[in-house]
Amino acid sequence: MLFRSGGLLQGIGMTLYEDVWYNEKGVNLSNSLMQYKIPTRLDFDKIRVEFESSYEPTGPFGAKSIGEIVINTPAPAIAQAVYNATGVWVNELPITPEKILKGMHVI
């Protein structure tokens, strides 16, 4: 499962978890996995991944790259889902409950 959905999980992590914090002197405060959150296998159940057959005439033997593409797709999909559910556009990552509540003028 992981080898088929790893890029997708990375994209979800980038969208919902990953954030870099710096102090006023520019020192990275999130330089370990204690502060820099990423998802683990325990955060997700099974994800169904399907491949569509196609032919790319410029690729080797008709192949296409898929590794990097899947990282970019969760962010707009999740942002759209948040907007559909709440009416709030979150336009910077990560998308957090705090940002959604601020957009709803709750906090």
Please annotate each region the language model reported.
Residues F3-I107:
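C-terminal catalytic domains of large/alpha subunits in multi-subunit enzymes
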